[in-house]
């Protein structure tokens, strides 16, 4: 089991704060929701939709690999596995069985900034999803046997998904080289050594700090009655005690003053690849929308600049992708170009840099901006197609921006981005001094194969 503030009306109800959001008339399809904060700090977002007799429940914990300290990496992702190994009233494997036997699906995912757990179930099984998530938040079963079992599973996942995958080392190296702050330098899955060294006490302490109601957002979306659902949530989650606020991570990133570069000889890669990464401001920055439009102009679709020039005309690369990563930030604007057979990484890199310089100084056509706006509108629509995706987005906006209603302003915000905005962020951030380059070169495997 391995992904931008909004209008909010606030009024007090007993010990809770409840919010309701109305969509902007200019932002297209919107999500209606109510938001409540329980006395223990849990934020509860409910969105009613009777399109289908199902609902999705999402618990968004504000913990990711950025919260891990050196020597204890991989803990957030480890819990993505541990959280399905049983709690006080749910035995090992029973979480899966109860969900699947009642016609549901479930999963979890971890990134640098957050961990998600979610289920989609028939509407008549609302109590089940709430019960399962509350029980493991309250009383996760953390034992040596569970830890050893899931530690081995995660280590094998690392071997298969990173260590023995083409370009795996290169992908990990980009963050290691680009960042000075240790919070984002290491991979989400962690190191083998740190996973091996983790003790039950280490893991239990991490759980107590971060998997608490005051460090989480609960979103339930689908065929439900918000008033009835809120009372069920209060009953199940309301008595889980809050914990002291987790330590705040200093995300300050020193200004990079010179290009950083490394070559990786990869026995698993069949084609060379050039990766460039530029540091960009946090997702909460006013510049973030322009950075995203920049990525669309450079690489989204066959009409994009990279495709037309580097793939189609010059035939130097088989593919070129560009865009900002999902990190809250400071983030990375990444470019990944797979070198075409018979071409060189040097030629591809030169072509990429030439296109960046052309964008900075030359005109950006009106149709390119319009294309980015249309893509944003399409993303809004596709993001509303399932109760699960709506719930994930609601929780994400609440957590990242502390303004859930911003979810209904995405297309409207992109529509305000101008060509001048795009050229300004390109000139500001896509510079040689702010650049990290990782070049992957295929090489024959050593005798005996990859280890």
What are these regions (language model features)?
Residues 75-83, 294:
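Active-site His/Glu-centered metal-binding helix of metallohydrolases
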Residues 85-90, 137-145, 364:
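Short, polar/flexible loop-turn hinges at active-site or ligand-entry regions and domain interfaces
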Residues 26-36, 135, 157, 175-216, ...:
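Histidine-acidic residue clusters that define the catalytic metal-binding segment
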Residues 4, 13-44, 225-265, 273, ...:
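Proteolytic maturation boundary segments
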């Amino acid at each position: 089991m391995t992904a931008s503030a909004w209008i909010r009306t606030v009024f007090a109800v007993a010990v809770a704060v409840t919010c309701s959001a109305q969509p902007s008339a200019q932002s297209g399809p919107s999500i209606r929701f109510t938001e409540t904060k329980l006395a223990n700090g849990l934020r509860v977002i409910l969105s009613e939709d009777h399109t289908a007799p199902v609902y999705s429940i999402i618990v968004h914990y504000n913990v990711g690999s950025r919260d891990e300290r050196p020597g204890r990496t991989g803990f957030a992702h480890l819990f993505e596995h541990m959280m399905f190994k049983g709690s006080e009233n749910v035995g090992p494997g029973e979480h899966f069985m109860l969900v699947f036997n009642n016609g549901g699906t479930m999963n979890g995912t971890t990134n640098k900034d957050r961990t998600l757990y979610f289920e989609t179930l028939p509407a008549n099984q609302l109590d089940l999803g709430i019960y399962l998530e509350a029980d493991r938040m309250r009383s996760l079963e953390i034992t040596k046997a569970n830890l050893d079992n899931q530690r081995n599973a995660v280590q094998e996942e690392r071997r298969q998904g990173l260590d023995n995958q083409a370009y795996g080392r290169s992908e990990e190296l980009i963050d290691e080289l680009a960042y000075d702050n240790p919070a984002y330098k290491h991979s989400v899955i962690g190191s083998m050594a740190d996973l091996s060294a983790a003790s039950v006490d280490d893991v239990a302490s991490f759980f107590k700090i971060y998997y608490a109601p005051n460090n989480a957002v609960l979103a339930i979306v689908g065929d439900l009655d918000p008033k009835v659902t809120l009372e069920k949530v209060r009953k199940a989650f309301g008595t889980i005690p809050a914990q002291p606020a987790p330590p705040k991570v200093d995300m300050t990133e020193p200004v990079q003053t010179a290009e950083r570069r490394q070559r990786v000889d990869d026995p698993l890669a069949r084609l060379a690849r050039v990766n460039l990464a530029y540091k960009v401001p946090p997702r909460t920055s006013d510049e973030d929308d322009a950075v995203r439009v920049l990525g669309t102009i450079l690489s989204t679709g066959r009409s994009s600049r990279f495709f037309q020039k580097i793939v189609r005309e010059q035939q130097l690369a088989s593919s070129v992708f560009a865009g900002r990563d999902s990190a809250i930030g400071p983030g990375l604007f990444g470019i990944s170009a797979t070198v075409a057979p018979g071409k060189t990484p040097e030629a591809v890199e030169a072509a990429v840099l030439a296109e960046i310089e052309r964008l900075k100084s030359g005109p950006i056509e009106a149709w390119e901006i319009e294309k980015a706006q249309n893509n944003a509108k399409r993303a809004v629509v596709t993001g509303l197609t399932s109760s699960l995706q709506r719930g994930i987005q609601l929780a994400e906006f609440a957590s990242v921006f502390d303004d859930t209603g911003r979810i209904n302003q995405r297309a409207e915000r992109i529509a305000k981005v101008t060509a001048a905005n795009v050229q300004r962020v390109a000139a500001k951030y896509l510079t040689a001094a702010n650049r990290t380059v990782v070049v992957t070169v295929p090489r024959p495997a050593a005798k005996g194969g990859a280890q």
